[in-house]
Design a protein with these regions (language model features):
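N-terminal juxtadomain amphipathic helix
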Residues: 60-62
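Exposed, interaction-prone extracellular/peripheral surfaces
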Residues: 1-40, 50-58, 67, 76-112, ...
């Protein structure tokens, strides 16, 4: 972002944006994993092209061991680059994301993940789009390579106000088919686990995309903490609650967790497309790991 535009940002947003950009620039693992000639979003092409000498930084999985054994030097296979991939982020800004048992809420981490997806796509010159839904707003960025528009979208996300706690987002709880996304796009569905079960229309629609469910999980969602002596603020009930972690509470939590997991699997049956991000872990590291796992599937 230009110096004049950067000057217009408030200090908090400017600091957050600079931190995201510098983290991406400073992460050598990104360039090592993806290579300079192809996008991490595309993976490698499937059509074989030729064999070339292996150089430092190339993907070790591409080594042609037969040619290497015959010639005595490391050689790797080259593949024809896959067609253009459009990256589309669907961010459902549900009030439940405002929960967090630690220093960061799930919403803060979700927004950071969305920003990394936008910035990384801009760096790789991919077309990227976004649909940001909440109970009060619905904002859409049509797929673009325009870096200025992408940076403006990152700033908008960083400055976005949390939705009202007492206004649940019905569109977030029961996802509907999103129109206007080019077929074959990589769709990152960043949201809480949907309610109910997917409709036949959803199943038919999702087959046209590389659709990956991404949710942020707090440690308290996995298990009941041993120490619940301190009062807890429930963002959905909008009140302070006190709980005693006895056997009955743990049993109820276990039932809730199991039911939630069943819903998660019903919406994303393929375990390779279900991605859980730990609210306490580094968002960028988790995001790159998710993309690299998807790259191996291609």
């Amino acid at each position: 972002m230009s110096g004049s535009a950067n000057h217009l940002l408030d200090a908090k947003t400017r600091e957050a944006l600079q931190r995201l950009v510098w983290r991406l620039r400073g992460r050598r693992a990104v360039s090592t994993a993806t290579g300079s000639e192809r996008s991490i979003f595309r993976g490698r092409g499937m059509e074989f092209d030729q064999v070339v000498k292996y150089t430092f930084g190339d993907d070790i999985r591409d080594v042609d061991w037969n040619v290497t054994a015959k010639l005595g030097d490391l050689y790797r296979k080259c593949f024809v680059e896959e067609r253009e991939v459009v990256v589309f982020i669907v961010f459902h800004d549900d009030p439940a994301l405002q929960f967090g048992s630690g220093p960061r809420s799930k919403r803060e981490v979700a927004i950071e993940l969305a920003c990394y997806a936008l910035l990384l796509a801009a760096t790789k010159r991919e077309r990227v789009g976004l649909l940001h839904r909440s109970s009060s707003t619905e904002h859409r960025l049509q797929p673009t390579r325009d870096r200025r528009r992408i940076l403006a979208e990152v700033v908008r996300l960083l400055q976005s106000v949390s939705p009202p706690l007492r206004q649940p987002c019905e569109r977030c709880r029961q996802p509907t088919v999103v129109t206007g996304i080019p077929r074959g796009s990589l769709v990152l569905w960043l949201a809480e686990i949907p309610e109910g079960s997917p409709s036949p229309q959803w199943r038919a629609w999702s087959r046209h995309y590389d659709l990956r469910g991404v949710r942020v999980e707090d440690a308290w969602e996995r298990s009941v903490p041993n120490d619940l002596s301190a009062p807890i603020f429930d963002p959905i009930a909008d009140q302070i609650v006190r709980m005693k972690p006895d056997a009955s509470v743990r049993a109820m939590h276990g039932q809730w967790r199991d039911e939630r997991e069943r819903r998660w699997i019903s919406w994303w049956p393929d375990s390779r497309r279900r991605n859980v991000m730990d609210v306490a872990a580094d968002p960028l590291n988790q995001f790159i790991k998710m993309l690299r796992a998807g790259e191996k599937r291609r």
